[in-house]
Amino acid sequence: RGCRLGISFPEIYEMQCRAIFEALAQLKKKKIKSAFVEIMIPLVSTEAEIKIMKDLVVNIANEVQKQHKLKIEYMVGTMIELPRAAIKAKEIAKHAEFFSFGTNDLTQTTFGISRDDSGKFLNDYLDNKIFSIDPFVSIDDGVADLVDIAVEKGKSQNKKLKLGICGEHGGDPKSIEFCSK
């Protein structure tokens, strides 16, 4: 799953990246100036993982650019969806132009619970005030702390680091309020 697949079977990611960059090259040849892509490396937990995967992406992009004799615009970033990635964000940001916070997985891995089986106990946790909110609906304060840590550490390494969020929290007003800070 995630970048592990690309490290264990790089030919899969090479094929996917080549297809993306070939499509981008075709758009550039058609003079579509807005043609741009962001490649997001998923489930990164170490600097080495993103470095290996970014090198793969850059190599394929260079091959396609050379083959088509044109420059293509792209960025490489990662999804921050593991607590370790948030804690090691400074090192990861050395090789990322953006972070997208995968708050669904970050919530699951922070609590050690699965959305698939949380329905069996979540109401009990809410009734007993173990959780004040459903952490899969609104960002929990512990998950928010991990996001804050990752933003601070990532931006300390790369001032231009672009930030985003993906997942269901992106549609929740309380979570949006947190992200706007």
Q: What kind of region is each of these model predictions?
A:
Residues 1-181:
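Conserved alpha/beta-domain cores
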